[in-house]
Design a protein with these regions (language model features):
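Mixed-charge, glycine-accented linear interaction segment located at domain edges/termini
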Residues: 80-111
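Contiguous, amphipathic alpha-helical segments that mediate oligomerization or scaffolding
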Residues: 12-52
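Generic secondary-structure boundary/loop-capping signal
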Residues: 9-12, 62, 83-85, 91
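N-terminal functional modules and adjacent low-complexity/disordered segments of proteins
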Residues: 3, 60-62, 100
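Compositionally biased, non-globular sequence tracts
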Residues: 8, 19, 74, 78-80, ...
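Histone-fold modules and their flanking histone-like tails across chromatin and transcription assemblies
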Residues: 1-15
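Short, structured protein-protein interaction patches enriched in aromatics and acidic/basic residues
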Residues: 36-76
């Protein structure tokens, strides 16, 4: 097994072409602000489901974001779900591009 690990920050930024990362930030801000304003707790849940794409070294990642924030008289919630296909490289490293893809700007470089 390789020592290479999935870069989590890069991984999250690639989900739904960066939109998912922005939605996480918005949910955190919204829930934290409402929690302070109303004095009751909130919740942000991120869920990842992996399914193999047959005959490839890829997985389809279903990524879900749900959050619940307190309001003046109760709470409000939202659920979002998207899919992003990604490559699985050596040791299970997950990336948006294959690890052995040639650098198109520098064909002499090693992958």
């Amino acid at each position: 097994m390789s020592n290479e690990k999935t870069n989590v920050a890069e991984f999250v930024s690639e989900l739904q072409a960066g939109v998912f990362e922005q939605q996480i930030a918005t949910a955190i801000n919204s829930v934290a602000g409402a929690t302070v304003e109303h004095g009751r707790g909130g919740e942000v849940v991120i869920k990842l489901k992996f399914k193999h794409i047959p005959n490839t070294a890829q997985v389809n990642i279903e990524h879900s974001l749900s959050f619940k924030k307190p309001t003046k008289r109760g709470s409000s919630s939202e659920d979002l779900t998207y899919d992003t296909p990604m490559y699985v490289g050596k040791g299970g490293k997950v990336t948006i591009f294959p690890q052995d893809q040639m650098d198109m700007l520098n064909p002499q470089a090693k992958a």
